[in-house]
């Protein structure tokens, strides 16, 4: 029988080790409530004490790196709440508790409730960023849910008056401490949403102990803040005070004064921004006007270069040059003919062939007559062509058209308006008349039938 059980035989060391591992792995970290006794603190700085109740007790140790975070000095007979790991001291086989944190029993229980509610609401998604509403920018009316006699309200109103005196503020007075406070805070949030007067709410109070701030760790308050259609800024206590309301709110402010800073505009800064914007707008307008003026000058010069009067003047100059060339050519031919006549006359006078001279003279006279008639005909033809060209240019000249009562309209970028689809109501157009320009705005566009 002994041989069949040898595989189950433990040494003392193995037994203690196995029990320690089971305790640490199965139990993990637990909260323990009890009364302190036999408290000692040796030179090492560690704490050793016993936790007991009416029927049992357990040895506890709290090492120096943990106990220095405790904010009070434990006393014999004091009721405390300890967060600890369960283990076994193997050399002696003593079962003991290794404490990680310690709180007075009343505050400790509240902290435990706080952690439980925080975990519950977090699991439900009430803290998720996707549910956070953006704050209005700027706010047109601020609602404040707090005590009407507390310092928090005074701080909020002082900051709002300094930063934006014209910003309307509606106060929803409520208790912020005591058994009735959570219900009043919930009703104030619901009332603000029902009345719809504000576009942002500040919910908060001044600093205090965990018990003082407990109304803002109430589940009813948390769910009312989450359900609010109006964005909520939580402002509970000081920067180190963190409540459930802070996690559920759309934004957490470290203090009531900071909440007022967040929801209000700084009028001086706003004035500087407006002045800066005006300056930038003025510079942009100056640049735009200078650019349009430069563009107008360029177009004006181009139009001047294409003006019908300039084109007519250039053609008149060309025609005058042609007339001069024709005159020079005529004079040259007459001179040549005269010289030939003189040479012929000289030869004839030397040979004295009188009949031949008469024929030649007659021929010369005919040539002179034909040449003169030809020149006159050419000049008359050129004058007629010139007159026709002038008449044609005057007929197609925009100035002549304008003189008959017509106008030419262009868009702001210089395009000539030919169809109504080139403009719409509200557009600006420029119209050229015979004696100047006018600028007008299109009121309506009606297609032709």
UniProtKB/Swiss-Prot annotation:
Record flagged with keyword Cytoplasm: yes
Name the record gives this protein: Exodeoxyribonuclease 7 large subunit
Top EC category: hydrolase
Family: Belongs to the XseA family.
Keyword Zinc-finger: no
Pfam families: Exonuc_VII_L (PF02601), tRNA_anti_2 (PF13742)
Organism: Salmonella typhi
A GO term for molecular function: exodeoxyribonuclease VII activity
């Amino acid at each position: 029988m002994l041989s069949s059980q040898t595989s189950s035989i433990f040494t003392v060391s193995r037994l203690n080790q196995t029990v320690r591992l089971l305790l640490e792995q199965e139990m993990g970290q637990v909260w323990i409530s009890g009364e302190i006794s036999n408290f000692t603190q040796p030179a090492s700085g560690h704490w050793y004490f016993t936790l007991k109740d009416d029927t049992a007790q357990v040895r506890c140790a709290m090492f120096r790196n943990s106990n220095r975070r405790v904010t009070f000095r434990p006393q014999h007979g004091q009721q405390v709440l300890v967060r600890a790991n369960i283990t076994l001291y193997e050399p002696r086989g003593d079962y003991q508790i290794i404490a990680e944190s310690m709180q007075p029993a009343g505050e400790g229980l509240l902290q435990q409730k706080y952690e439980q509610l925080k975990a519950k609401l977090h699991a439900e998604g009430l803290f998720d960023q996707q549910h956070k509403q953006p704050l209005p920018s700027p706010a047109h009316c601020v609602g404040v849910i707090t005590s009407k006699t507390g310092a928090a309200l005074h701080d909020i109103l002082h900051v709002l008056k300094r930063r934006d005196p014209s910003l309307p503020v509606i106060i929803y007075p409520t208790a912020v401490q005591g058994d009735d406070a959570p219900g009043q805070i919930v009703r104030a949030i619901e009332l603000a949403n029902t009345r719809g007067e504000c576009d942002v709410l500040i919910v908060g109070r001044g600093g205090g102990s965990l018990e003082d701030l407990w109304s803002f760790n109430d589940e009813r308050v948390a769910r009312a803040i989450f359900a609010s259609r109006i964005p909520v800024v939580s402002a509970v206590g000081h920067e180190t005070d963190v409540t459930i309301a802070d996690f559920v709110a759309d934004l957490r402010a470290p203090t009531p004064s900071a909440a007022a800073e967040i929801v209000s505009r700084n009028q001086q800064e706003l004035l500087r921004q407006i002045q800066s914007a005006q300056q930038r707008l003025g510079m942009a307008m100056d640049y735009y006007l200078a650019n349009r003026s430069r563009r107008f000058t360029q177009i004006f010069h181009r139009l001047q270069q294409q003006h019908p009067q300039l084109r007519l003047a250039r053609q008149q100059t060309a025609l005058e040059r042609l007339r001069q060339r024709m005159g020079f050519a005529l004079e040259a031919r007459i001179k040549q003919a005269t010289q030939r006549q003189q040479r012929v006359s000289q030869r004839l006078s030397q040979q004295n062939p009188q009949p031949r001279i008469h024929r030649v003279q007659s021929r010369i006279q005919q040539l002179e007559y034909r040449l003169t008639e030809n020149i006159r005909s050419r000049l008359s033809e050129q004058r007629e062509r010139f007159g026709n060209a002038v008449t044609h240019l005057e007929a197609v000249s925009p100035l002549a058209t304008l003189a008959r009562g017509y106008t030419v309209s262009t868009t702001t970028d210089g395009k000539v308006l030919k169809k109504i689809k080139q403009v719409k109501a509200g557009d600006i157009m420029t119209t050229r008349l015979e004696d100047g320009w006018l600028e007008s705005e299109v009121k309506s566009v009606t297609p032709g039938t």
